[in-house]
Structure formats: C-alpha cells, structure tokens
C-alpha cells in the first residue's frame, strides 16, 4: 500500500557545530490518513564504515496518535559516545541516519554524511594519536541527503510486504542510493520519466555503502528525547529539504 506519511522537510539546526554538541533537527511531515498508533523516530550514528557493531542509537521519539494533516516537531539527541567508536574512525567522515517506523516496521531511512574535523590548523596538519574531542567540529552535509523507502502494512487489511531481495545484502555504490531531489538527469531514459515516480524504491543499505566513502576519506580523496511539540496547520505542498540558516 502507498505510504500514509510523507516527510516534507528536515531542517538540520545548529549546523555546523562542535562534536560534543547535541544533534537537533526540525521535522515536518504529512499524514494522509489518521494514524491510530505512534510513529517511532530514531537517530543513529554510524561509528564505523566496516561494521554495524559500532552503530549507536542516539535517541528515539514516539509521536502519535496522529490526525490527518501536516505536523512538525523538533527532535534532538546527544552526541555519540566516543568510547564506542574506533579511535581511527572518530576523525573523518561518518554517517547519520534518521529512521521512522510504524507498528515496528521501518518505512523510511534518511542518511547524511558527517564530516568530523579539527578547526585548529595545526591539529589538522598534525592530528594527535588520541583525538581531542573538545577540539573537533561536526558538519552534516545537508546537500547530500540519501533516502530509502520500504513498503509496510499500514493496516491489518494491507497485503504482507514482499521479502527483501537478496541483492539488498550486497554492497552498493553511492550512485545506487536515491537522492530526495534530482536537480539534473543526463540520461535520455531518465528524461522520459521526469513526470513519473516509480511505485517502489529498492532497499539500499547506507551502512554498507559507507564502506567505500570511508576508505576514500581516509585516503584524502574526499572532504567532505525528541521534543514532541507538534504543530498541525493543514497546509500542503512540497518544501525542499535543507539546513536552517
């Protein structure tokens, strides 16, 4: 069944910030039919590009039940626990994931690359063996948002979603991820589909695709609980995602 929820806008607040600062984002979403159960929002920090063992759930928030219409709330979370991140992965590029579930079923996964680096030039040139956390800055790359959606059962009457294809377990390049907005399509085949949106989005594992990006970052080839105060205004229309200025 088609999704009953559309994520209209995610504004990353206080970006850039220091590594030890809280993550804070303002989320605006539309509900097309009344949802009797909570939406569960979860913010995850990917601590390593080689293993999920270092993923940290920074916080989660339950919002609901939710009437039809447009809603907004602010979700904040503490910074990741440094002791749970491999030392070699603290400085450099990481990934931040925002997931949303309904009835314990994940239906959207949004990911941003995060650049953690020193603001001091000398520390950049000669980074200490043990990272100085209080000197690290953090910038979420909002222009490089990646979105993956999944079919779920919104009601008991909905058909059971098909199992995920084994292809989803393979490592994907970043080009296989679906950007929320596509500013330009070079292929003729894509131009023919400008006015159409595919019914389903293939599941892509952001954690796995991060492997290549992390390796490139280390090689120097790339630089790169919730506050549930809801607002309901009944407005409609698309809003581009980005960070708040």
Curated annotation (Swiss-Prot):
**Which stretches does UniProt call biased (Acidic residues)?**
157-166, 184-206
Q: Which Gene3D superfamilies match?
A: Histone chaperone ASF1-like
Region Disordered: list its residue ranges: 157-245
Record's subcellular location: Nucleus
Compositionally skewed regions (Basic and acidic residues) per UniProt: 167-183, 215-245
Q: Which UniProt keywords apply?
A: Chaperone, Chromatin regulator, Nucleus, Transcription, Transcription regulation
What InterPro entries has UniProt attached to this entry? Answer: ASF1-like (IPR006818), ASF1-like_sf (IPR036747), Hist_deposition_Asf1 (IPR017282)
Query: Record's superkingdom?
Result: Eukaryota
Disulfide bonds, which pairs?
A: none
Q: Which GO terms describe its biological process?
A: DNA replication; DNA replication-dependent chromatin assembly; nucleosome assembly; nucleosome disassembly; oogenesis; regulation of brood size; spermatogenesis
GO terms for CC?
chromatin; nucleus
UniProt keyword annotation of Thylakoid present = no
Example of a GO MF term: histone binding
* Membrane-spanning ranges: none
SUPFAM superfamilies registered for this protein in UniProt: ASF1-like
The record's function comment reads: Histone chaperone that facilitates histone deposition and histone exchange and removal during nucleosome assembly and disassembly.
Record-stated family: Belongs to the ASF1 family.
Q: How does it assemble?
A: Interacts with histone H3 and histone H4.
This one is known as: Probable histone chaperone asf-1-like protein
């Amino acid at each position: 069944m088609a999704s009953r929820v559309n994520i209209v806008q995610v504004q990353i607040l206080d970006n850039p910030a220091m590594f030890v600062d809280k993550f804070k984002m303002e989320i605006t979403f539309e509900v097309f039919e009344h949802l009797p159960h909570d939406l569960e929002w979860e913010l995850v920090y990917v601590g390593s590009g080689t293993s999920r063992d270092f993923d940290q759930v920074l916080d989660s928030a339950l919002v609901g039940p939710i009437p039809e219409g447009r809603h907004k709330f602010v979700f904040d979370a503490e910074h990741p626990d440094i002791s749970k991140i491999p030392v070699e992965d603290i400085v450099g590029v990481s990934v931040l994931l925002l997931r949303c579930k309904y009835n314990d079923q994940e239906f959207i996964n949004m990911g941003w690359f995060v650049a953690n680096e020193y603001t001091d030039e000398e520390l950049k040139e000669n980074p200490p063996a043990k990272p100085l956390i209080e000197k690290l800055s953090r910038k979420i790359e909002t222009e490089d948002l990646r979105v993956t959606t999944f079919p779920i059962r919104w009601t008991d009457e909905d058909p059971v979603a098909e199992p995920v294809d084994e292809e989803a377990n393979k490592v994907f390049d970043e080009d296989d991820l679906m950007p929320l907005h596509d500013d330009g399509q070079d292929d003729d085949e894509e131009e023919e589909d400008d006015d159409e949106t595919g019914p389903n989005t293939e599941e892509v594992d952001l954690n796995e695709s991060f492997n290549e990006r992390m390796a490139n970052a280390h090689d120097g080839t790339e630089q790169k609980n919730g506050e549930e105060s809801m607002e309901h205004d009944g407005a409609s229309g698309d809003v581009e995602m980005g960070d708040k200025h």
